[in-house]
Amino acid sequence: LLSNWREPDIARWSFNHLRQLLPTAPMRPANPPTAFATTRQNLDGLSFLDARGDRQQLGAFLAASQSDCFAVMKDGKLVYDWFSGFGAPDRQHIVFSITKSMASLLAGVLVGAGVIDVQRQITDYLPELGHSAYAGATMRHLLDMQIASGFREDYLDTDGVFMAYRRASAWNPIEEGDRNDGLRDFLTKMPVSDAAHGTRHHYCSPHSDVLGWVIERSGGASFAELFSRHILAPCGAQHEAYISLDTFGAPRV
């Protein structure tokens, strides 16, 4: 399954059962949790024009588009939620790159506490990256995704740097005969670029993994523990979350 868990025919199952496929770390909910305030409305019949100009009704559209979950909040109150057979309020569902925003939120907490300084260089926290694309870049560059690197985020890649990244992070199987040194070893070899840091935005998933590494190094605990402590507990989270790990225990942020 590790070779095809993101393929359309099994993705809806695997997105709800990732902990059976990959190493993960639990992130504790609040104790006690806080219940959502609600002002529920039935929005199934809400109509809108889709990208083709055709009129759709929300409930039918969510089912036809193979959505798993959908929620509407207004003024801090839950107005509407919708679940397919692959979603439920207490079911853990992968959120992919939403984790990047969550990691930045956690970094903001540590910045506010004086633990992380956005003006310092990344290598002040992670000297291991001194010979990678991250050399000379600041934490501000990292948070803004303005790191100059030769990494290409190519989701169709089958044998290049992006596939190597997926294998290093345990999202794809290691080929027979290949060596797996893990995600953080991959980050130490991040390909460099002739461009200067801070000159353009470059969306690059490994940057968030570097941020997760800085968070662990500066925060003195695992990403999962720090996220539980500083985000899930204060916001009153009702259910446990998790984050996937590589085979060495590094979080895939």
Residue ranges: model-predicted function:
Residues 197-200, 252-253:
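Active-site rim elements
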Residues 60-61, 81, 105, 109, ...:
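Residue-level signal for well-ordered alpha-helical scaffold segments within enzymatic catalytic domains
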Residues 96, 201-203:
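Catalytic tyrosine of NAD(P)H-dependent dehydrogenase/reductases that use a Tyr as the general acid/base
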Residues 76, 94-118, 142, 211-215:
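Active-site SXXK
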Residues 94, 112-155, 189-192, 206, ...:
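Active-site helix/loop module of the DD-peptidase/beta-lactamase fold
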Residues 77-82, 121-124, 158-196, 222-240:
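Short, charged, amphipathic alpha-helices and their helix-cap/turn boundaries
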Residues 1-88, 113-116, 144, 148-150, ...:
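N-terminal leader/targeting segments and the immediately adjacent pre-domain N-terminus
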Residues 89-93:
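Loop-to-helix entry region of an early transmembrane alpha helix in multi-pass inner-membrane enzymes
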